[in-house]
Amino acid sequence: MRQRVRQVLVIALPIIGGMTSQNILNLVDTAMVGSLGDEALAAVGTGSFANFLAMAFITGLSAGVQTIASRRMGEGRDAETAVSLNGALLIALLIGLPLSIVLLQLVPYVFPVLNPDPAVVEQGVPYLQARVLAMVAVGMNFSFRGYWNGVNLSQLYLRTLLVMHAANILLNWVLIFGHLGAPAMGAVGAGVASAIATYVGTGYYFLLGLRHARKGGFLRKLPDADGMRTIGRLALPNAFQQLFFAAGFNVLFWIIAHTDVADQAHATAEVAAANVVLNVTLVSVLPGLGLGLAAASLVGQALGRSDPEDAKAWGWDVVRIGAAVMTVLGLPMLLFPDLILGVFLHEADTLELARGPLRLVGATIGVDAVGMVLMNALIGAGASRASMVVSIATQWLLFLPVAYLLGPGLGLGLMAIWTAQVSYRGLTALIFAHLWKQGRWMSIKV
């Protein structure tokens, strides 16, 4: 068991490190833009979320590449591990380029719907336009991430993110504030810096690919028609899953903002409390996500070796590790919520609203880890359609309608909505555990 734990951690730790570094960069970004005032911060905040939603679909390529690369590695077809990566890079170019041009034209019409404040719109529109121009690079970067994770080279993913973040912070300093002879572009400079840094990451990934993936067929040949269809079959469900998951966050905040409470000030406090609880949760679940991606690779490799029982065992082994790690990480949220919330919230009433939901998250995050690991394990086995159906159905057909009923319908407030949130995540974990135990995923051909 010790050897298996080590195998999991060798893949998972660089992924967790990379994801954590992304969150740290977001905080640095916020601090640098925050010095420009509330309008600039609101422009970047709204623009960042809109960009997350715009990019969600193309990031689905990562799962398709990882599933195929890990399967080929397990099959011993080392000369073909990077062929799916070549196909995904072409798809990222063919979809990302026209889509980014269309979005560039749509941003001035869409942004005022998200935030009607003219001062925010003035800075937010060019910020978001700069970000969407990086769509091709985002699609390619996620394709590379899937490949490195699939062939147990996740440390290259971490290394590239650190290069990107260093470039982003330097470019922020130059373009936001006008150093080294550049014009002071303010919030727009943050968007341009992020876009350039994303392309820097793509360039670095290509250099790493030439060094570490040529023997796997990198830039040597494209998949045949069946191979391209396989990438689409695996990537499309994950793309829709990512898109609906991101959109669900938007709907959740709308529900909380429209909860029937005594006055607008209380509604605003509930939105602020929810925002902090959600952001703390998103950081806390990173180890679970990293372990899930490790499970996807190990499951794919075992299936490639024609050893479905070992694949099944990998799923349960990573679940045990994930549940234990996440339960320990949840204890501070459960036992000392005010210490965590006090960093972000300074109004006593808002902190009071956030305390109960954060405790709930702390108490149940170990169960959530089970769902995260097995969802990714199923994707790694090629069952991305089943993963999509469960995720979208439980979020959109169950949780969001119940949240609307509890909030705007009955006016029960944030604690009731968060009880529904952790209950739906628990149900999702149970369904994924049932699907994993059932084992129909063992016969999927990739």
Label the predicted regions:
Residues 20, 24-42, 111-118, 174-185, ...:
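Helix-terminus/linker motif at the lipid-water interface of multi-pass membrane proteins
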Residues 62, 66, 131-149, 157-165, ...:
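Short runs within selected transmembrane alpha-helices of multi-pass transporters and secretion channels
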Residues 16-17, 53-57, 94-97, 131-133, ...:
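Hydrophobic alpha-helical transmembrane segments of multi-pass membrane proteins
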Residues 10-26, 130, 164, 197-201, ...:
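Transmembrane helical elements of multi-pass membrane transporters/channels
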Residues 15, 19, 30-31, 48, ...:
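Transmembrane alpha-helix boundary and packing residues in multipass membrane permease domains
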